[in-house]
């Protein structure tokens, strides 16, 4: 078992990584007898894990309720959020209640946002069931919902009291879902750790066959990298922006397609290549590393081009609404020099971005 602490003074919390974490109630669960818990999950995860986790909690003396939501990024919405609030209010849950988000990034984001806003803030625990959520979405306190005009435009920073990462759940993922998580893993390496990128080049095949020691190391390394950034910049006002590599382009893809056709990881993978090509046009990155990135994404089963139906104009319409953009100026996180280094480039020329998107898609 691995334990990583997110260091945020009084709001510090543990990330626990191990297999078989749903078998026994272990002391690292930050719950006490008679705590009131509401398990929030979706209709894909519920048939596999809901009863297992709920029965574990009940056997341990935890008062446990449940709420099953529809699956899908398109359901990360105000309507679904209201469903959670209605459940909590009808059952008279008070501020001592603890929510547990059992699912992927969508469940984690919306459960966290419900916790951030219900009665001005209650506690919650993240139990991520996808690789993407385990290495990224469940960590760091970003919570929120989508709007038809943009992804994650409504949200709050609200840290969980724990993140419980059970490696066993990865065996139930499709290859598409697993590859989606690999996009965020590759992002960490490009942005922060060239040695980790080299490790991924050597061990990607081990990850694809779910080799447990490789998974443990990989997920732990991603959590360590993100923890180091969050400890410095919890609210995304400085260095945390490096974690947005590829996301301005990728969020444009998701928004344009209505959050239903491409997964988050697929969108980010294409977005990473667009960021790489933008950096090449700015003469701040090298072709050799660009080829390594493209090859690793391809080996991971991820797209290295955007959707055929999107034009560069479509991208720019959404990218100008990005949270990092100001007054229509495009502020983009781009690779610089070599793998392991990125920086925010401010007011990037729109025409250059359009050409970079075309470079990627041709």
Curated annotation (Swiss-Prot):
Question: What InterPro entries does its record include?
Answer: Dehydroquinate_synthase, DHQ_synth_AroB, DHQ_synth_fam, DHQS/DOIS_N, DHQS_C
Q: Name one GO cellular component term.
A: cytoplasm
Q: What is its main location?
A: cytoplasm
Which CDD domains would you find in this protein's record?
Answer: DHQS
Protein family per UniProt: Belongs to the sugar phosphate cyclases superfamily. Dehydroquinate synthase family.
Family annotation (NCBIfam families): aroB
- This one is known as 3-dehydroquinate synthase
Q: Which organism does this sequence originate in?
A: Blochmanniella pennsylvanica (strain BPEN)
Q: Name the gene behind this protein.
A: aroB
């Amino acid at each position: 078992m691995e334990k990583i602490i997110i260091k945020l003074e009084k709001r510090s919390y543990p990330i626990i990584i191990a297999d078989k974490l749903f078998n026994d109630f272990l002391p690292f669960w930050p719950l006490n007898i008679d705590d009131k818990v509401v398990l929030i999950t979706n209709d894909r995860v519920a048939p596999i894990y809901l009863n297992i986790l709920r029965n574990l909690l009940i056997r341990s003396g935890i008062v446990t309720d449940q709420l099953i939501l529809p699956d899908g990024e398109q359901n990360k919405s105000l309507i679904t959020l209201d469903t959670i609030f209605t459940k909590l209010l009808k059952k008279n849950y008070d501020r001592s209640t603890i929510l547990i988000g059992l699912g992927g990034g969508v469940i984690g984001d919306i459960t966290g946002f419900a916790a951030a806003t219900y009665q001005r803030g209650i506690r919650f625990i993240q139990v991520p069931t996808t690789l993407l959520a385990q290495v990224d979405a469940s960590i760091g306190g970003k919570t929120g919902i989508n709007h038809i005009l943009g992804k994650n435009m409504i949200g709050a920073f609200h840290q969980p009291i724990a993140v419980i990462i059970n490696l066993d759940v990865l065996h139930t993922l499709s290859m598409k879902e697993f590859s989606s998580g690999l996009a965020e893993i590759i992002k960490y390496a490009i942005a922060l750790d060239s040695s980790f990128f080299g490790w991924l080049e050597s061990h990607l095949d081990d990850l694809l066959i779910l080799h447990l020691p490789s998974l443990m190391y990989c997920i732990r390394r991603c959590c360590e990298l993100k923890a180091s950034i969050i400890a410095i910049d919890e609210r995304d006002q400085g260095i945390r922006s490096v974690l947005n590599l590829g996301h301005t382009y990728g969020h444009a893809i998701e928004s344009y397609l209505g959050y239903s056709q491409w997964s988050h990881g697929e969108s980010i993978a294409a977005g990473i290549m667009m960021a790489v090509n933008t950096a090449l046009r700015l003469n701040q990155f090298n072709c050799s590393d660009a080829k390594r990135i493209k090859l690793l994404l391809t080996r991971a089963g991820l797209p290295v081009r955007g959707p055929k139906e999107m034009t560069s104009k479509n991208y720019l319409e959404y990218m100008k609404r990005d949270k990092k953009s100001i007054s229509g100026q495009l502020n983009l996180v781009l690779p610089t020099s070599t793998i392991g280094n990125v920086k925010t480039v401010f007011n990037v020329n729109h025409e250059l971005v359009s050409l970079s998107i075309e470079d990627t898609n041709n």
